[in-house]
């Protein structure tokens, strides 16, 4: 049997699939051939299968380095449920429990061993690794090794030395969902990958509907509550920037009768574990979390992710939003933002980064990098281009024809023309072009009048003729620009100022109190032929339901993902009824075995089951996601439910 045949056989036996997803086969065969690999694949594309198949086919243990221990138990449970012996070593175990795992791994009884990168630095683990055959090392979330990435973790810097120190170096696989070209180079260099086979699959997630809503902070909680109320049977994640907002929003949802749990780094380990358990077992449908929840979830049926605040980077947003729809089913990702979010993010960025492993100069380099990452995120909020295209271009790829929509619409080179992806709010909106030359020039002159010494709030007040007490020291009435824009809406002035900063006419000096200064293109605003426009969504969108209009009253429409746009299969009433019965059975089995429902079967597998309606072993194995081990464990109970349903329908 060739390596290719063996890999396909293992894929079918353990995972219930008869073919690999794009990119998987090449990575699997490279690792089986003893070659290092770097796999950059979107969340939900099956990165873990790329090292789990080689682990199943290799004689020794595969060491999986993963950043969050909160995820390990679920990963290990899922693998054991597939018939792949797996275990973890982390701080939740007693010394005796760890000793048992070490002994099992040394005896060849464990195929995959999960550890955090900090574990590699302990003498006990290094001794274990020196005397235990390790056939493969898989580094998950490999972007954490790079200071240029959005989630740098200094503990990852020791992985390369650990690998070098092994008596016999095994092939190494590094995997991530988010990595620009610069981050990829860091991963290869810092982990010491040797001539790796690099696989970068498309970054687009066509089953996700991307939505951007500009909304004042005071309206955000109502927007979220309305969305959750309209989707009572769906699992969702709501990300917030601070612990305080996280707890307040979770309390608000609960008070309104929408069960939700909070999750953030300030909670005790037991409280975080309980919150995560309630969410992944479907006991509570919604988790409101800070980014501490970012890599700690492996739940396949999350139907929506809402960002209550602006994320720190496109990488962070892509990864967090990517928690939705991991099973390939249509899901929605909504970003709520406003100008205050940008100011808050910049302040957090400047005040929140310290690392004892780095010199002050290196820390400043990291800060500058993170400022550039934030600029990319702000650009995502303001673009009028296709949001799928913006995302893929950011990662260095062009959106191909048919990408961004599984319905198969062709996307033109410019989404403002005929091509619309059908899976983002920009492509479902009509934008109007507004001439704001006078506003832009007035702003630029006012920045000059105040000597580049104040923030955007004071600039706006002066231009609109405010005599507020906090302006007295500036004596604004003597300035030529005082009251120059008193006829312009305050929100419009703020909007133009912010857009000018994005376009380089202005810059925002970083610090505790951000100051508006001239940007690299400032001189252009004084030119006789200077012309400046902004694009804003019209109140009536091209397709009803765009969240771009930003009003709470629009929430009911904006909550609906167009099924035809996402190419989703629409089941008939019988299939939907059977699907719900299969979900109930899955929940019952999950409670009996004490595991999350998605570990039994994913929603996608249950959908396929409801469509095929298998009543024999052969038919059951034909369902996507059903392998022999799952058939042995659960097949009879599911087929009995299907047979009973068929009998009832026939009568």
List each language-model region with its residue ranges.
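Accessory DNA-binding and partner-docking regions appended to nucleic-acid-acting proteins
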Residues: 1-7, 90, 343-344, 349, ...
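Short alpha-helical segment immediately N-terminal to, or the first helix within
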Residues: 30, 307, 380, 608-609
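Helicase motor core with emphasis on the C-terminal RecA-like subdomain
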Residues: 3-14, 18-22, 26-48, 56-58, ...
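Cys/His-rich Zn2+-binding cysteine-cluster or related metal-binding knuckle/ribbon modules and their
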Residues: 243, 348-350, 357-404, 408-409, ...
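Flexible coil/turn residues that form the inter-helical turn or adjacent wing/linker of helix-turn-helix
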Residues: 168, 232, 384, 452, ...
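Amphipathic, well-packed alpha-helical segments that form the structural scaffold of globular domains
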Residues: 12, 32, 254, 392-396, ...
């Amino acid at each position: 049997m060739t390596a290719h045949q063996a890999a396909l056989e293992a894929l079918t036996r353990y995972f219930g699939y008869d073919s690999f997803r794009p990119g998987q086969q090449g990575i699997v065969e490279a690792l089986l051939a003893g070659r290092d690999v770097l796999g950059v694949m979107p969340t939900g594309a099956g990165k873990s299968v790329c090292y789990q198949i080689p682990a199943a086919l290799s004689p020794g243990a595969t060491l999986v380095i993963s950043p969050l221990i909160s995820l390990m138990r679920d990963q290990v449970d899922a693998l054991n449920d597939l018939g792949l012996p797996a275990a973890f070593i982390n701080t939740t175990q007693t010394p005796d429990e760890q000793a048992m795992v070490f002994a099992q791994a040394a005896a060849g009884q464990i195929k995959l061993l999960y550890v955090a990168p900090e574990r590699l630095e302990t003498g006990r683990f290094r001794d274990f690794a020196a005397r235990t055959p390790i056939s493969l090392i898989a580094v998950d979330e490999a972007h954490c090794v790079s200071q240029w990435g959005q989630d740098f973790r200094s503990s990852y810097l020791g992985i390369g030395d650990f690998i070098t120190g092994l008596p016999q170096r095994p092939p190494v696989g590094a995997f991530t969902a988010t990595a620009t070209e610069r981050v990829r180079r860091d991963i290869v260099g810092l982990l010491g990958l040797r001539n790796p086979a690099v696989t970068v699959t498309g970054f687009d997630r066509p089953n996700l509907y991307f939505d951007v809503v500009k909304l004042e902070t005071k309206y955000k909680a109502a927007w979220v509550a309305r969305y959750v109320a309209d989707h009572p049977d769906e699992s969702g994640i709501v990300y917030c920037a601070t612990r305080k907002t996280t707890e307040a929003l979770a309390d608000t949802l609960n008070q309104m009768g929408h069960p939700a749990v909070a999750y953030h780094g300030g909670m005790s380990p037991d409280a975080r574990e309980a919150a995560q358990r309630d969410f992944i077992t479907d006991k509570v449908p919604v988790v409101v979390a800070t980014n501490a929840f970012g890599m700690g979830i492996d739940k396949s049926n999350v139907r929506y992710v809402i960002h209550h605040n602006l994320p720190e980077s496109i990488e962070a947003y892509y990864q967090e939003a990517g928690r939705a729809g991991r099973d390939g089913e249509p899901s929605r990702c909504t970003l709520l933002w406003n100008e205050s979010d940008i100011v808050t993010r910049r302040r957090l960025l400047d005040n929140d980064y310290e690392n004892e492993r780095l010199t002050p100069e290196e820390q400043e380099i990291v800060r500058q990098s993170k400022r550039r990452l934030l600029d990319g995120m702000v650009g995502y909020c303001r673009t009028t281009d296709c949001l799928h295209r913006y995302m893929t271009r950011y990662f260095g790829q062009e959106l191909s024809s048919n990408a961004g929509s599984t319905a198969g619409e062709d996307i033109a080179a410019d989404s403002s023309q005929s091509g619309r992806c059908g899976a983002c709010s920009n492509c479902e909106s009509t934008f109007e072009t507004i001439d704001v030359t006078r506003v832009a020039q007035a702003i630029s002159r006012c920045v000059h009048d105040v000597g580049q010494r104040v923030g955007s709030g004071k600039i706006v007040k002066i231009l609109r003729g405010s005599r507020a007490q906090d302006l007295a020291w500036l004596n604004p009435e003597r300035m030529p620009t005082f009251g120059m824009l008193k006829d312009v809406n305050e929100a419009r002035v703020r909007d133009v100022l912010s857009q000018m900063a994005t376009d380089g006419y202005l810059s925002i000096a970083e610090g505790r109190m951000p100051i508006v200064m001239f940007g690299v293109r400032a001189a252009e605003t004084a030119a006789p032929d200077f012309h400046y426009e902004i694009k804003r969504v019209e109140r009536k969108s091209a397709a009803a339901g765009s969240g771009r209009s930003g009003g709470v009253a629009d929430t009911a429409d904006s909550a609906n993902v167009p099924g035809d746009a996402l190419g989703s299969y629409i089941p008939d009433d019988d299939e939907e009824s059977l699907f719900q019965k299969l979900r109930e059975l899955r929940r019952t089995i999950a409670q009996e075995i004490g595991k999350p429902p998605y570990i039994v079967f994913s929603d996608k597998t249950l959908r396929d089951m409801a469509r095929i309606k298998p009543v024999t072993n052969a038919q059951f194995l034909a369902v996507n996601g059903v392998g022999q081990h799952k058939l042995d464990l659960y097949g009879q109970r599911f087929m009995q439910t299907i047979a009973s349903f068929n009998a009832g329908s026939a009568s």
